[in-house]
Structure formats: C-alpha cells, structure tokens
C-alpha cells in the first residue's frame, strides 16, 4: 500500500478491526471505518455469525 485510502462498511454482522498504533475497533452493521492504507491493518470475526463487509480502496496513481 502506497499512500492510498481505504474504507470499510459493515453490511451485516460484527467484526474487530485492528489499525497499527490504535486500539481495536469493534464494528457492527452499518458502521464505517476510513483510514490511510499505509497503516498496517487486519480484521477478524470473533463471533460464530457470518460477517459481510464492503471494502473500497483508492490509489494515489492515475490509471
């Protein structure tokens, strides 16, 4: 990842989102998280229920 941005939108369920240097974010249905994508990140589903999410990523480069 080089200078772009990302957004996560939870369509259904709950997930925990981890951004390097930040406390974990507990996201639920309809929650949104926006961050620069050069920050280390990962997510997990800590429940037995399925999670559906939409992730959008931008690039600083023109294509």
Task: Outline where the language-model segments fall.
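Short histidine-centered beta-strand/loop micro-motifs
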Residues: 1-2, 19, 44-46
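Short, conserved beta-strand element in jelly-roll/cupin
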Residues: 2-17
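Short secondary-structure boundary/capping segments
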Residues: 7, 24-25, 45
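Conserved beta-strand segments that form the floor/walls of ligand-binding pockets within enzyme
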Residues: 9, 34, 55
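Short beta-strand segments in beta-sandwich/barrel cores
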Residues: 13-18, 32-33, 41, 61
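Short acidic-glycine-tyrosine-enriched beta hairpin
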Residues: 21-36
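Ligand-binding loop in jelly-roll beta-barrel domains
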Residues: 28, 37-63
